[in-house]
């Protein structure tokens, strides 16, 4: 999923959209359903307006224009495109039911979509099997965006995970709905009464954040995170892969990640994949932590047998200390845009796009299906003087917006002459990773490119 850009970062109308990666449902908007391993330019897309944000979900994509129009494509089995039907859409199509209702931000979940209007109202469509639409007595699916009436406060940010969603209000509160975290919580916290916001099918205020003012929130598959106006990061939910930087296997209430993990700097932005997190601090440093077996963290870790033993309470054990501790990724210092898919990532640094992580469907854009272990330039995107402006991720696909020069340079056989600092050759190590194994997290009846789903990101403009 993607960080939603604010209106002040609107991309010029001359910008063009590129898409690549998993495409089993037409989520790339290219008019077919074949995976694409190199970025492909979408012709004549969205000429009437500027592109403000790009993002994706389990098998669908969404683009918001400067004028507030929403364009969608891809999987639509549960009505997640909001078009009034359930047929797949292979090219970006304007969401007509929202005409006259300008959209500010979109968050794509696994099989549902959350929209935020310019007036601060939240809409939803798609699957409601786990209460993720925030309409407790509504139908099991909704094919047209509907307002979440019980969320009466003005909202400034929305996020969508696998089976839950969040909204941050103008007053700094966070609301959560959808039962995506409830099953893990009951299993990992036996005998405990879970807070209402973990089990609610309508927006419920997240308790434990009363003494802070939230500016945004993000969602993973089984976890959530919230960033405050003072640069503090709170996390809650499942911690199987160390993504909560805690010894607990499950955090039912928000817990602050200590500032020393970020070298005592304030956090200004956070993004979430399915089981990993990325944060940026006030000086532009980028930190990653969480699941790492597909290269999600952009750095190679020592194998467990090579790590020094660390004393831990076995009842509170979580995956080894290397991946559970936020660590700086020096080659991304100063990145202006970052987006997390389910297990892959995109970043914009010095007007160039870099990718790393899971690459089974070519979503890293290097022309292969081998995982990418360190941030690596996407060479097939247009070179200088073109500028990479926006990036966005779905579960297993990628989107990018480039500003092309007046006379575009051909994209074929492009070479990057100045590799990024810390950029190292990515060697294939798939023998050590079974790409079809999801450690018990597989969701039945899903095609491979829908087996992971990212959670999106947010950036604070108020941290001082």
UniProtKB/Swiss-Prot annotation:
The keyword Disulfide bond does not apply. It comes from the Eukaryota. The keyword Phosphoprotein applies. RCC1 repeats lie at residues 15-67, 68-119, 120-171, 172-230, 231-283, 284-351, 352-402. One of its GO terms (cellular component) is cytosol. Gene3D superfamilies: Regulator of chromosome condensation 1/beta-lactamase-inhibitor protein II. Residues 422-464 are annotated as: Disordered. Disulfide bonds: none annotated. The modification Phosphoserine is found at residue 429. It is found in: Cytoplasm; Nucleus. One of its GO terms (molecular function) is guanyl-nucleotide exchange factor activity. InterPro entries: RCC1/BLIP-II (IPR009091), Reg_chr_condens (IPR000408), Ub_ligase/GEF_domain (IPR051210). One of its GO terms (biological process) is negative regulation of protein secretion. Keywords: Cytoplasm, Guanine-nucleotide releasing factor, Nucleus, Phosphoprotein, Repeat. Probable guanine nucleotide exchange factor (GEF), which may be involved in the secretion process. Interacts with SEC5. The interaction occurs only in the presence of magnesium or manganese and is stimulated by dCTP or GTP. This is Secretion-regulating guanine nucleotide exchange factor. It comes from Mus musculus. The gene is Sergef.
